[in-house]
Regions:
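Hydrophobic alpha-helical membrane segments, chiefly transmembrane helices and signal peptide h-regions
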Residues: 89-90, 272, 296
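Generic alpha-helical structural element
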Residues: 40, 112, 226, 230, ...
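Generic structural hydrophobic/aromatic packing signal, biased to beta-strands
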Residues: 117, 165, 207, 241, ...
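Membrane-interface aromatic/basic loop that binds lipid-linked glycans or pyrophosphate carriers
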Residues: 282-416
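Nucleotide-sugar donor-binding/catalytic module of glycosyltransferases
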Residues: 1-254
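A broadly tuned preference for mixed-charge, low-complexity surface segments
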Residues: 168-169, 255-265, 326-336
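P-loop NTPase catalytic cores that bind/hydrolyze ATP
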Residues: 258-288
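C-terminal, non-catalytic tails of nucleotide-sugar-dependent glycosyltransferases
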Residues: 232-263, 302-320, 324
């Protein structure tokens, strides 16, 4: 017997509050022949009971229990063994498909003969809905037929959410690890789609993060968790990059095309997966940030020669290594604990060794001078002046960009 048109794979763990909402958003799609495979990764709350009730009420729901909690990647891999659809999409138990979103993905896949379909997603916290700045890129937002080589900005959208993959093209792909485990899988799936990636403008996926009042961790606990997550991400980033490079070598004949994809992924890792956690550690003055500096330095040291320089030429906003990794600790040097400063010096040295023209990526002449002095002098008056100049330069740049955005918003629209 042939399988359904679409398989939706959901992994759940202690999701008693959100499971029904997630599954209901799938089952509401009555225009598609689908199955909803829900893998319970060893839940200890009411999730197993709720899942059993849902599966008993609708034959489209297939419950797959794991013997014990094994992590999201292992649970997803178990789900991949069960799904039968021609097309596959993934949904987190905390999130939901927007009404009609799954139908729009499937319609684009069928009518446009795509290898993969990429829809839009929004973020919601119960009070407002927004689009993350990281995803607000023309390669992601502008509809049309694309490939990762021609539209490397798609690499920034390396989560499995809001996408539809032809299942035959992902044969043999597996998720690995608890951190960054989905990114190489998604990038490999998109690489296998070649120039058959169809981007649609419809918002199909809602990424929901709300917490009950008083249920959140303390600021200190949350900060330490974020820093540790960054350390873990840096520790596995080299392996993730290696997987992407290997898949690109198989999928792309042109060496330049392979480097474009690899460089885009490096830029994404630095800007989002590592830079974001570094920024949070600085915001709160986390005393363990030295470990994060060391982990990022190890990743930079292990990166293939020239790849960081390639990445710096891809981002229109400037070099992510300078902007998101090297400069932020200098701009908030007073928040860097004394024991972490030696680790930062090693990080800065690794960055300069990997990208000798790093200081050229300052936003202006003052910025470049300040960065040069701060990187090569460990203290003294010139160092303190450079730090002050760096802060002034970056603040001026942010103000300029803010006013520019305001002017674009209030500028009268001309009629064609």
């Amino acid at each position: 017997m042939s399988g359904p048109a679409v398989s939706v794979l959901i992994v759940v763990w202690n999701a008693e509050r959100s499971l029904r909402r997630a599954v209901d958003s799938v089952l509401a799609e009555r225009d598609i022949d689908l199955e909803c495979v829900v893998v319970d990764d060893g839940s200890t709350d009411e999730t197993p009971r709720i899942l059993a009730e849902i599966a008993a009420a609708d034959p489209r729901v297939i419950a797959v229990p794991m013997a014990a909690n094994a992590g999201v990647s292992a649970a997803r891999n178990r789900g991949l063994e069960v799904v039968r659809g021609e097309w596959l999409t993934l949904l987190d138990a905390d999130d939901r498909f927007r009404p009609g979103g799954l139908s729009e993905l499937h319609r684009a896949a069928v009518t446009r003969e795509a290898g993969a379909v990429v829809g839009q997603q929004v973020w919601s916290n119960g009070r407002r809905t927004w689009i993350s700045g990281l995803y607000d890129r023309s390669d992601i937002r502008r509809p049309g037929r694309k490939s990762l080589v021609a539209a490397p900005g798609l690499v920034y959208y390396a989560s499995p959410h809001g996408k539809l993959f032809r299942r035959s093209s992902i044969a043999g792909l597996t998720f690995e690890g608890r951190v960054l485990g989905d990114q190489p899988w998604v990038i490999a799936a998109l690489l296998r789609a070649g120039d058959g990636i169809e981007v649609i403008g419809d918002v199909v996926y809602e990424w929901i993060r709300t917490a009950p009042a008083g249920a959140g961790p303390s600021i200190t606990t949350a900060t330490r968790a974020s820093t540790q997550h960054g350390i873990d991400a840096a520790g596995v980033a080299t392996g993730a990059l290696t997987r992407v490079i290997a898949e690109a070598s198989t999928a792309i004949a042109d060496p330049d095309g392979r480097r474009i994809v690899a460089a885009a992924y490096v830029d994404r890792l630095l800007r989002s997966d590592l830079g974001a956690h570094l920024g949070r550690a600085l915001d709160r003055g986390d005393p363990t940030m030295g470990e994060l500096f060391t982990a990022i330095a190890d990743f930079i040291d292990a990166a293939p020669a020239g790849l960081l320089a390639d990445a710096s030429r891809l981002d229109a906003d400037g070099d992510s290594l300078a902007r998101d990794i090297v400069a932020p600790p200098l701009m908030r040097w007073h928040r860097v604990p004394e024991p972490a400063r030696a680790a930062y010096r090693r990080l800065a040295a690794a960055a300069v060794a990997a990208q000798p023209d790093l200081i050229r990526h300052g936003r202006n002449r003052l910025d470049r001078w300040a960065l040069r002095v701060a990187l090569w002098e460990s203290g003294g008056l010139r160092f303190r002046i450079a730090l002050a100049a760096l802060r002034v330069s970056r603040a001026t740049s942010l103000l300029s960009r803010g006013f520019g955005g305001l002017r674009r918003r209030i500028r009268p629209r001309t009629r064609s």
